[in-house]
Swiss-Prot record:
This is UPF0147 protein MTH_1407. It comes from the Archaea. HAMAP family: UPF0147 (MF_00342). Belongs to the UPF0147 family. Pfam families: UPF0147. Disulfide bonds: none annotated. InterPro entries: Ta0600-like_sf (IPR023130), UPF0147 (IPR005354).
Length: 102
């Protein structure tokens, strides 16, 4: 009976890892879009680049990476100089990452 519980929990964990990897890939793509957009202020593009590097660091736990990026992006989403389209993308990223953190 204990073996069944262990197998079931490992399947759940593997599914969670795949889901977080898919989410990180989607978020990374959005961040690259922000980084390449010249209408976005340089400080926001730098924050997007830093966030992308953190997301792609396999040495950290996925929840730690998600929480760190949420913190960075939450700060820049309140920047008065961020264009509306970039703010909307940041909010989309925050929404995606909140699902991993929980």
């Amino acid at each position: 009976m204990n073996i069944n519980i262990i197998l079931y929990s490992s399947r759940i964990q593997q599914g969670g890892l795949n889901m977080s990897n898919e989410t990180f890939n989607r978020v990374s793509e959005i961040l690259r879009h922000i980084m390449e957009d010249n209408s976005v202020p340089r400080n926001i593009r730098r924050a997007a680049e830093e966030s992308n590097e953190i997301l792609n660091n396999p040495d950290e736990d996925s929840t730690v990476r998600a929480s760190t990026v949420i913190s960075i992006l939450d700060e820049i989403s309140n920047d008065p100089n961020i264009p509306i389209h970039a703010r909307t993308l940041v909010w989309e990223i925050l929404s995606e990452l909140e699902s991993i953190r929980e």
